[in-house]
Each structure stands twice: as structure tokens, then as C-alpha cells.
């Protein structure tokens, strides 16, 4: 008797509906119906408005802002489990708490590990995410993790710019692996910024390792938070003789006065995905959607086909 995969349905947490609608459209099915009730004390309760018994359920939820979205996702996973869904895959374009991947000082938690345990305890049978801040977070899970790379969608855009004398730059030492991966596909040089922080999100000094004289520079990073690092790196590149400076960052957190920093910086363009909705528009920010990538990989998961071809890094 042949084995037939269960039907798939896609649902979304309340703050990821727009992205989920695009994913569902690319996938070729309507977005599933779910309602969210909120009690007077602030508690919320999701409810699936259609049967999911025996089905493969994808739940799209970027966990930013972190606390409420994560709790909402956990409740949706639990509800799907109790409604007898056969497979439950949280699709987490931006994985919150990923910066807490180790103990970097005494008496602090490993938040990413805790989140992994919570997702699995709630009932997740597979995890799908994109550009984790630290690759080793995949090892925090016992269930399979499909870790996608935004390079799949960024590289075609970069190639379309036809930039001469292109140089890829990492804004810090930790991102050098990512920078070298991009340079491999673009056949370009690499430079690295060495920074020393005074405190979290506060940069002390920054120095450049490499030459950018007469080059068109593209900074690559997994996220942009306050924007301080990229703004300072762009200023440094121009100071060292770069012709232009762009940046590609998968996750646009853009907290505090980040928009103002970007507008006032030497960055010609900031390219991001829609893993996190932008708070406002900016003439310097270009959004490249990750919806087609997620829809394609979700199809591959549904059909039990290899997704290794989607990994460019």
C-alpha cells in the first residue's frame, strides 16, 4: 500500500499574517483560519477555525517582539497538538533569543536552548527558520531543523547590481564566515571590521582589516538592531576610500533610533528581508521577500524531497 503524505495547511500568529499570506499564496493554498481571543488580564487564546486532524500544519511566526509572539506560537503549537495534527512545523523566519546561545558571563541563562525546549515540549515535530544568529542553535533541538539562508534571495539581487570592484565586508569578526561565503559566490575580496564594545549595543573602537580603496563595498550581517555597528562601519569604509557602501541584513529589528542612523549614515542602501515587518518606510531600505523561499522549502518538506540545494552557505 502506497504511503500518502497528509494534506498541508498554513496558519499564522497574529503579527505574522502579512508574511504568511504571501507564503500561502506562493505555496498555492489559502491561509488557514485562526482566531485570537484576549482576556482582560492580557492572556490570549488561539483557536483553529477549521479541522486540522491528521494534517501537516505550518505555523508562521517571527518571534519579534519576542515575549508575546513566542507565547502565542507555543499556544498555537499546543492547540494543534491537541487537535490531532499529524505534523506540526513552526516556521520562524526570525528566531528570537538567538543571541543568547551561550553563557558569556556568570549567572545568565542560555535563552536559545530554553526556547528550543519550549517549542519541542509544546509539540513541534520539525522547526524551520532562517539565518540563525549562531548556527550551533540547531544542536539545541532534538527534532529536525531546516535552517535556511537568506543568501539564496540576496545573491541574485547583488548580482543584478553589476557592481565593479566589489568587496564583501563583515562588520565584526564573528561574521567573517558569512562574508567569506558571499565572496565565494560573488568572486570578490573580503575585508573585516574589528570592533570593541563598551557595552551591549555600544561600540568603542572599530578598525578595518583589509583594503577598500576604490571598491564598492557590501556589508553582510544576519541582523541589524540599533544600526550603530553598520553606520560606523560604513563611515569607516568611506574614510578608507570606498566608492560606495551597501549592507544586506536578513532581520531588520531596527530598534531605537536605528532608522535615523541609517538615514544619516554613509550607507547607500540597506537590503533586508521581510522576516520582521518594517515599522516605517525609508528611501534607503529595500525589502526582498523571503516568502518564495519558505514556500518552496515547505513544498519540499511536504513532498519529502531534499532541500540541500537551497543551502548556498
Residues of each region from the PLM?
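PRPP-associated nucleotide enzymes
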Residues: 1-313
Amino acid at each position: 500500500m502506497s504511503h500518502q503524505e497528509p494534506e498541508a495547511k498554513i496558519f499564522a500568529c497574529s503579527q505574522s499574517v502579512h508574511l504568511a499570506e504571501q507564503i500561502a499564496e506562493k505555496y498555492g493554498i489559502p491561509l488557514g483560519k485562526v482566531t485570537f481571543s484576549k482576556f482582560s488580564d492580557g492572556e490570549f487564546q488561539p483557536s483553529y477555525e477549521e479541522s486540522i486532524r491528521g494534517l501537516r500544519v505550518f505555523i508562521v511566526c517571527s518571534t519579534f517582539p519576542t515575549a508575546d509572539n513566542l507565547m502565542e506560537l507555543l499556544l498555537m503549537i499546543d492547540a494543534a497538538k491537541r487537535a490531532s495534527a499529524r505534523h506540526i512545523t513552526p516556521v520562524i523566519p526570525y528566531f528570537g533569543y538567538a543571541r543568547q546561545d551561550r553563557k558569556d558571563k556568570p549567572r545568565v541563562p542560555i535563552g536559545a536552548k530554553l526556547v528550543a525546549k519550549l517549542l519541542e515540549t509544546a509539540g513541534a515535530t520539525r522547526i524551520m527558520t532562517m539565518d540563525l544568529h549562531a548556527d550551533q542553535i540547531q544542536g539545541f533541538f532534538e527534532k529536525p531543523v531546516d535552517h535556511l539562508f537568506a543568501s539564496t534571495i540576496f545573491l541574485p539581487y547583488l548580482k543584478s547590481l553589476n557592481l565593479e570592484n566589489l568587496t564583501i565586508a563583515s562588520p565584526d569578526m564573528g561574521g567573517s564566515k558569512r562574508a567569506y561565503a558571499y565572496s565565494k559566490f560573488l568572486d570578490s575580496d573580503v575585508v573585516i571590521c574589528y570592533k570593541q564594545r563598551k557595552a551591549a549595543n555600544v561600540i568603542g573602537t572599530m578598525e578595518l582589516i583589509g583594503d577598500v580603496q576604490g571598491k564598492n563595498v557590501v556589508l553582510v550581517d544576519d541582523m541589524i538592531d540599533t544600526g550603530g555597528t553598520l553606520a560606523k562601519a560604513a563611515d569607516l569604509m568611506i574614510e578608507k576610500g570606498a566608492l560606495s557602501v551597501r549592507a544586506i541584513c536578513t532581520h531588520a529589528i531596527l530598534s531605537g533610533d536605528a532608522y535615523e542612523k541609517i538615514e544619516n549614515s554613509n550607507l547607500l542602501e540597506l537590503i533586508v528581508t521581510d522576516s520582521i515587518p518594517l515599522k516605517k518606510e525609508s528611501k534607503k531600505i529595500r525589502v526582498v521577500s523571503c516568502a518564495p523561499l519558505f514556500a518552496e522549502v515547505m513544498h519540499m518538506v511536504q513532498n519529502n524531497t531534499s532541500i540541500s540545494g537551497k543551502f548556498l552557505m
